[in-house]
């Protein structure tokens, strides 16, 4: 379930106890000038949340997941660790793929990236324009060469 920008206590309560993963789209809220989804309230209520780009030409013309993670941390009050988890494992769960993707776990497909040195995981979210990704791996294999700085 996505586009939850206007969710309140009643909607959050309805999601609680279900198998539905609320998928939050901060890029769409940013582009359309809407209020951001209440991620902190959902997390406080015990819900898992996923993050997605909603990449499309009408309401979210960017598939930049670094920006999505940054907006979740900066505008939706998620910690950087929560935002990264929401964009990876919870995103895979929302698509019914968490048994094969979303975390670095034996038996799962190894899709991941390596970063340049950072002082902390928080730096990844808050320095969203700094070129931090060094190498990308899909199915355990490096894609191309090192990412230019």
Place the predicted regions along the sequence by residue.
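Active-site-adjacent C-terminal substructures of enzyme catalytic domains
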Residues: 1-100, 128, 142, 148
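Structural signature of the urease/amidohydrolase superfamily beta/alpha-barrel
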Residues: 50-53, 92-93, 98-124
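C-terminal cap of metal-dependent C-N hydrolases
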Residues: 87-89, 109-149
């Amino acid at each position: 379930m996505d586009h939850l920008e206007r969710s309140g206590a009643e909607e959050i309560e309805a999601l609680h106890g279900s198998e539905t993963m609320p998928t939050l789209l901060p890029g769409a809220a940013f582009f359309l000038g809407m209020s951001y989804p209440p991620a902190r309230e959902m997390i406080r209520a015990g819900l898992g949340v996923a993050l997605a780009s909603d990449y499309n030409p009408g309401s979210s013309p960017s598939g930049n997941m670094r920006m999505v993670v940054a907006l979740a941390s900066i505008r939706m009050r998620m910690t950087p660790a929560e935002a990264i988890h929401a964009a990876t494992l919870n995103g895979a769960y929302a698509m019914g793929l968490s048994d094969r993707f979303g975390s670095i776990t034996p038996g799962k497909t190894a899709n991941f990236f390596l970063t340049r040195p950072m002082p902390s995981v928080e730096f990844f979210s808050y320095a969203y324009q700094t070129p931090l990704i060094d190498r990308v791996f899909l199915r355990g294999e490096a894609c191309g060469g090192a990412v230019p700085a």
